């Protein structure tokens, strides 16, 4: 299946939207050393990865709960992220404004967790928000109605903000249904959002376990030089492999309990992965993740 997704990525690179000249052209600022630029916002630590490509890493204890990315093209800016409260949106906009006067033409919503109407609904009026069709269904099903302009797609889409390509791929089921990853081929930078956690067990409460494993295989196949996870520092393909190894060990252990007929309650009482105790979020999230994995695997593997 990941081979099919890889083909989708290549095909999506061929489907482009044209650049719109919203501001006078200026020479892009030279890339500086990988240090944060001071700006009036508290959510993100900004790290330049390549000319015009920036990782927005969620600060510990800050308002942001997941990382983001933004790309400054010759004509406009593309930003991407998830779990966006009004404060986090404004902080990301401030971080971008500290580096360019070009407009944010598109914001890519990487995914949305159904039932959470305090996030992903406060983009400014007039902001174009791109998402997968599955994410749009989640947004559209909420009690709260979005006031921003939305566009959604099926498999893939490539944006051309000027001098760089921003390739969007709809992974389908993984962390949620309709996860989007963002690849900048010229910089070999990949934004994986919450499909990837580095040094963390992550949140799996809406995940699709076997599909998620296939998605991780797909991310490895891209072989990006720098990968922005949903949580943790900027990494590379080795970090995808390591998270995938944890994920496989986790699911293998869950299946052992299911196959011997243990109930969910018995599994929760006895489950343990001592070799991963040091990972961030283990104590807080492992049982929640276990409930989701037990239910998902039971539905798919039990006769």
Predicted stretch roles:
Residues 25-36, 221-223, 234-303:
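Accessory terminal helices/loops
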Residues 5-16:
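Bacterial N-terminal signal peptides
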Residues 94-160:
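Active-site HxH/HxHxD metal-binding segment of metal-dependent hydrolases
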Residues 52, 71, 81, 96, ...:
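Divalent metal-coordination and catalytic microenvironments
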């Amino acid at each position: 299946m990941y081979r099919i997704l890889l083909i989708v990525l290549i095909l999506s690179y061929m489907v482009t939207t044209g650049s719109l000249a919203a501001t006078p052209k200026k020479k892009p600022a030279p890339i500086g050393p990988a240090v944060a630029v001071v700006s009036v916002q508290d959510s993100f630590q900004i790290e330049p990865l390549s000319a015009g490509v920036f990782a927005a890493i969620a600060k510990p204890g800050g308002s942001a709960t997941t990382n983001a990315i933004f790309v400054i093209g010759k004509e406009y800016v593309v930003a991407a992220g998830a779990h966006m409260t009004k404060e986090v949106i404004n902080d990301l906009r401030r971080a971008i404004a500290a580096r360019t006067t070009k407009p944010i033409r598109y914001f890519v919503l990487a995914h949305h967790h159904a039932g959470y109407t305090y996030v992903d609904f406060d983009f400014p009026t007039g902001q174009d928000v791109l998402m997968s069709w599955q994410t749009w269904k989640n947004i559209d099903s909420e009690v709260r109605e979005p006031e921003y302009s939305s566009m959604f797609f099926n498999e893939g889409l490539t944006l051309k903000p000027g001098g760089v390509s921003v390739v969007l791929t709809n992974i389908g089921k993984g962390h949620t249904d309709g996860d989007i990853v963002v690849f900048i081929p010229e910089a070999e930078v990949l934004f994986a959002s919450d499909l990837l956690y580095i040094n963390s067990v992550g949140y799996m409460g809406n995940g699709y376990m076997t599909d998620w494993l296939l998605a991780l295989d797909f991310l490895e196949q891209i072989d990006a030089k720098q990968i922005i996870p949903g949580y943790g520092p900027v990494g590379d393909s080795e970090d995808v492999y390591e998270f995938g190894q944890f994920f496989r060990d986790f699911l293998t252990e869950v299946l052992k309990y299911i196959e011997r007929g243990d109930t969910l309650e018995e599994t929760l009482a006895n489950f343990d992965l001592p070799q991963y105790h040091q990972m961030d979020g283990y104590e807080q999230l492992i049982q929640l993740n276990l409930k989701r994995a037990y239910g998902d695997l039971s539905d798919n593997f039990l006769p």
